[in-house]
Each structure stands twice: as structure tokens, then as C-alpha cells.
Swiss-Prot record:
Lineage of source species: Bacteria, Pseudomonadati, Pseudomonadota, Betaproteobacteria, Burkholderiales
Region described as Disordered: 1-20
This protein's name: Large ribosomal subunit protein bL27
GO molecular function: structural constituent of ribosome
Keyword Cytoplasm: no
Length: 85
């Protein structure tokens, strides 16, 4: 006879790691070239002037300056730009 009952099984017990997405530098904030402005999945925010886009759609500053957000075009696209200082 078994001294203990069987352990059973469960379908739970796993979780994905956090991805730390979102806006990292807000409007009016001063940033340096290379600073990450937005980490995102897909292009929720589009790159404006002086902003580069990485292969995972991360937006980053190409020059030193201040961050500015705007809604542009007939599709109401949210764009991020850097105003050089």
C-alpha cells in the first residue's frame, strides 16, 4: 500500500515574464540621442522627425532634445518627434 496519496497534476503553474512596454519619456521631457522613448508591440506610436524605430518597433531619439507627441493625418496617427535644443 502507498503511504501517501498520489500528487495529482495541475494545468496551472506558468506565467510569462513582464515585457516592460510603454512610454518611457513623456512630452516636454529632455532626452539624449539614443534614449528609448516608447517600447511597444507594433506601431501604436509612429516615428516623427529625429526619431528612429528599432526592429521590435521601439522608438528612440536620434538627437538630443525635447520629446513632443502629436496626432496627425486623417488616420489620427499618434506620432513622436524630438525638438532639438
Amino acid at each position: 500500500m502507498a503511504q501517501k496519496k498520489g500528487g495529482g497534476s495541475t494545468r496551472n503553474g506558468r506565467d510569462s515574464q513582464p515585457k516592460m512596454l510603454g512610454v518611457k519619456a513623456f512630452g516636454g521631457q529632455a532626452v539624449q540621442a539614443g534614449s528609448i522613448i516608447v517600447r511597444q508591440r507594433g506601431t501604436q506610436f509612429h516615428a516623427g522627425s529625429n526619431v528612429g524605430i528599432g526592429k521590435d518597433h521601439t522608438l528612440f531619439a536620434l538627437v538630443d532634445g525635447k520629446v513632443s507627441f502629436a496626432v496627425k493625418g486623417e488616420r489620427n496617427r499618434r506620432t513622436v518627434a524630438i525638438d532639438p535644443v
